[in-house]
């Protein structure tokens, strides 16, 4: 089925984001890339590594968007609970994906490192998802077709997330969603504050059709 809605939500998962230990650059990058595809991000949510909090965020996102991108919580340690929560959310069980398992074995063989039990668990994925290959790391991405909403779960490591999104997610989005063309035009002004400019063009701005949006982005230049 083709989705006609072009609204998306981004959910970032991880205590390290909420306590300010790391800066969430994934959302900004995803927002830009989704915008290029004609998909508007209307909501961003950050939640802790807590099953109940993640489950609530997944439920609420479905009321707002037809595409939900989730990053984080796919690592091999016990605090990474995203995959288990998604399995419960979709009433699914975790199964071993043989392709992922083989890829994990190749990685650890190349690195000449032993595989721990926690590493093997990264080959476990919800039975109901489409696995998104991660050639840049060990945690695969996952694509879930919900009743009205598509959920995509990606690793929180930026370069892994970007690789999977570009190579695996974008082609699926183009196939699944009816995407509008979006054009951005920048008009630069100098010597006038945004409030004065807004007053001058108020009548023109009010006459714009609903599908055309105007944003004021003031920048202050300091000459040294």
Annotate each PLM feature.
Residues 149-224:
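An accessory alpha-helical subdomain
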Residues 13-15, 70-78, 155-156:
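Glycine-rich beta-strand-to-loop/alpha-helix junction loops that act as flexible
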Residues 46-49, 99, 120, 156, ...:
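Short beta->alpha linker loops
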Residues 65:
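An anion/phosphate-binding loop that grips the pyrophosphate of nucleotide cofactors and donors
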Residues 7-55, 59:
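ATP/NTP phosphate-donor binding region
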Residues 53-56, 80-177:
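Proline/glycine-rich low-complexity loops and linkers
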Residues 1-4:
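Short, small-residue-biased leader/transition segments that mark boundaries at the very start
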């Amino acid at each position: 089925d083709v989705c006609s809605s072009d609204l998306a939500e981004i959910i970032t998962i991880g205590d390290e984001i909420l306590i300010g230990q790391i800066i969430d650059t994934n959302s900004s990058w995803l927002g830009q890339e989704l915008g290029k595809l004609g998909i508007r991000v209307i909501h961003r949510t950050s939640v802790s590594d807590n099953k109940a909090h993640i489950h609530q965020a997944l439920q609420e996102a479905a009321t707002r968007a037809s595409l939900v991108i989730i990053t984080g919580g796919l690592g091999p340690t016990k605090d990474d609970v995203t995959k288990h929560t998604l399995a419960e959310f979709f009433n699914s069980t975790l199964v071993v994906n043989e392709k992922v398992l083989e890829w994990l074995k190749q990685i650890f063989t190349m690195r000449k490192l032993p595989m721990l039990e926690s590493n093997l668990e990264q080959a476990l994925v919800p039975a109901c998802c489409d696995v998104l290959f991660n050639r840049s790391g060990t945690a695969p991405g996952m694509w879930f077709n919900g009743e009205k909403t598509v959920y995509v779960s990606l690793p929180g490591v930026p370069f892994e997330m970007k690789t999977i999104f570009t190579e695996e997610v974008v082609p699926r989005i183009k196939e699944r969603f009816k995407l509008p063309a979006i054009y951005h035009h920048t008009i630069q002004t100098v010597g006038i504050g945004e409030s004065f400019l807004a007053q001058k063009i108020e009548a023109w701005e009010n006459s714009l059709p609903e599908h055309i949006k105007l944003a004021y982005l003031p920048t202050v230049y300091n000459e040294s």
